[in-house]
Curated annotation (Swiss-Prot):
InterPro entries to which the protein is assigned, alphabetical: 5-3_exonuclease_C_sf, Flap_endonuc, Flap_endonuc_arc, HhH2, PIN-like_dom_sf, XPG-I_dom, XPG/Rad2, XPG_DNA_repair_N
UniProt function note: Structure-specific nuclease with 5'-flap endonuclease and 5'-3' exonuclease activities involved in DNA replication and repair. During DNA replication, cleaves the 5'-overhanging flap structure that is generated by displacement synthesis when DNA polymerase encounters the 5'-end of a downstream Okazaki fragment. Binds the unpaired 3'-DNA end and kinks the DNA to facilitate 5' cleavage specificity. Cleaves one nucleotide into the double-stranded DNA from the junction in flap DNA, leaving a nick for ligation. Also involved in the base excision repair (BER) pathway.
Binding locations of Mg(2+) 2: 176, 178, 239
Naturally occurring in which organism (per UniProt): Hyperthermus butylicus (strain DSM 5456 / JCM 9403 / PLM1-5)
Family membership: Belongs to the XPG/RAD2 endonuclease family. FEN1 subfamily.
Listed name of the protein: Flap endonuclease 1
The gene coding this protein: fen
Amino acid sequence: MGVNIREVIPPEAIQEIDLAHLKYKVVAIDAYNALYQFLTAIRQPDGTPLMDSKGRITSHLSGLFYRTINLMEHGIKIVYVFDGKPPEMKYLEIERRKRVKSEAVKKYEEAVKKGDTKAARRYAQMAARLTDEMVEDAKKLLDAMGVPWVQAPAEGEAQAAFMARRGDAWAAASQDYDSLLFGSPRLVRNLAITGRRKLPRKDVYVEIKPELIELDKLLKALGITREQLVALGILIGTDYNPDGVKGIGPKTALKMVKAHRDPVKLLQGLPRHEFPTDPLKIYEYFLNPPVTTDYKLEWREPDEKKVFEILVEGHDFSPERVRNALERLKKAYREHFRGQQMGLDAWLRR
């Protein structure tokens, strides 16, 4: 779900960019968010995902492989950040997601029986699940491609934001806005999936382009601090209090945080029964989440044999397509990445 602050973000705080804007910049991508996008977007006409001969889903690997190569061809230094163990207070949201997916599976089966291909595709996308096996396969593929990834101790967006704050990454990338609450100086949206996309439940297609939101510009436009932004998110609803506070929408929440300059006192004054957990605990989590400095960002030459083994021999990908893509990846590495690496202290803070 993530926190949805889109409604209160002024147009002047959102900058539409092209991929050239990110050339030679390190972008920390929320891996789970990207993989879910690949799982939902890369599907057959009837809504079923791509699969190999053993019935194993491969949409996530296809998206990860080809999209990563495309980004690297633009000289973008991609690093994927994977979620670790979620905090206990996320339990309600996790259970809600399970219920939504289970219901979507039932509706998908009903749509298939009725021959309603549009509905079947929609519900199939909603039912997409990312398994531990899929995540491990993604990590193995990234290793073979020479692309770095980081294992977060908890929330991937918190880790990506931390990396951006300390200068190891230029921006965090996700469809959700949580990384802004976690303090990322920049958020890039629409990076994993761009191009012409169909709007949900409509026969309308729009051109999706990357967006850049800078935290300082956003806070200045709203006239609030990051701490107030966190309080605003909690009022609306986050992964740790999915329902937010009854009767409070984004615009009302913004008025409240601006009227109460102290976000702690504002949260303390809210009815406790509105929250599944202490709102101050949620507030503190956004400001000081578990993160790690145990990572090294290094872009290596791809291991062609290993990539072939994973995709072609392991998952029935087209040998010719993989071979051609590997040539593109090798060229991108030679042109943009050879000798490029960043250690734990980011070149001693540059």
